[in-house]
């Protein structure tokens, strides 16, 4: 973490912090600084992960274009693996939607018909009372 800072420099920073902030505020300041450092590390790791994912997607796209140019015949094992990964990803994306649509459609249909009838009856009864 402190690659360019030696022990003496850390000791000097600690003593200066103790003199400037005092013994009561120094622990709070150290905690807040370590929190900032953790947040920056998390952000950096998040950006790194997103870039790696985008590079992997870009590599898969380029492999797919190479496969299209070769006519999907006599593909190298590397290109075939990329195509298989794309097919698996497409299937995994489609599967959750198919599973969710079936139960929600059957469970929402009876519940929607019953409430829609009740408010209709209430609405038709309310205008008669307000006109009298």
Swiss-Prot record:
Entry GO MF terms: protein transmembrane transporter activity
Transmembrane residue ranges: 2-22
Superkingdom of the organism of origin: Bacteria
Subcellular location as annotated: Cell inner membrane
Cell inner membrane as UniProt keyword: yes
Region annotation Disordered: where it falls in the sequence: 68-132
Main location class: membrane
Topology with respect to the bilayer: Single-pass membrane protein
Keywords: Cell inner membrane, Cell membrane, Membrane, Protein transport, Translocation, Transmembrane, Transmembrane helix, Transport
UniProt biased composition (Low complexity): 102-122
Any one GO cellular component localisation term in the record: TAT protein transport complex
BP-aspect Gene Ontology terms: protein transport by the Tat complex
Pfam families: TatA_B_E
Function: Part of the twin-arginine translocation (Tat) system that transports large folded proteins containing a characteristic twin-arginine motif in their signal peptide across membranes. Together with TatC, TatB is part of a receptor directly interacting with Tat signal peptides. TatB may form an oligomeric binding site that transiently accommodates folded Tat precursor proteins before their translocation.
HAMAP family attached to this UniProt entry: TatB
Family, similarity comment: Belongs to the TatB family.
Quaternary structure note: The Tat system comprises two distinct complexes: a TatABC complex, containing multiple copies of TatA, TatB and TatC subunits, and a separate TatA complex, containing only TatA subunits. Substrates initially bind to the TatABC complex, which probably triggers association of the separate TatA complex to form the active translocon.
Protein name: Sec-independent protein translocase protein TatB
Origin species: Shewanella woodyi (strain ATCC 51908 / MS32)
Gene name tied to this protein: tatB
């Amino acid at each position: 973490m402190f690659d360019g800072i030696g022990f003496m420099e850390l000791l000097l920073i600690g003593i200066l912090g103790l003199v400037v902030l005092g013994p009561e505020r120094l622990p709070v300041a150290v905690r807040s600084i370590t929190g900032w450092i953790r947040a920056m590390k998390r952000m950096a790791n998040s950006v790194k992960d997103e870039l790696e994912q985008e590079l992997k997607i870009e590599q898969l796209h380029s492999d797919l274009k190479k496969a299209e140019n070769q006519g999907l015949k006599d593909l190298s094992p590397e290109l075939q693996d990329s195509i298989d990964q794309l097919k698996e990803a497409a299937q995994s994306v489609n599967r959750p939607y198919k599973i969710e649509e079936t139960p929600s459609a059957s469970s929402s249909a009876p519940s929607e018909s019953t409430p829609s009838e009740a408010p209709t009856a209430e609405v038709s009864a309310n205008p008669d009372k307000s006109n009298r």
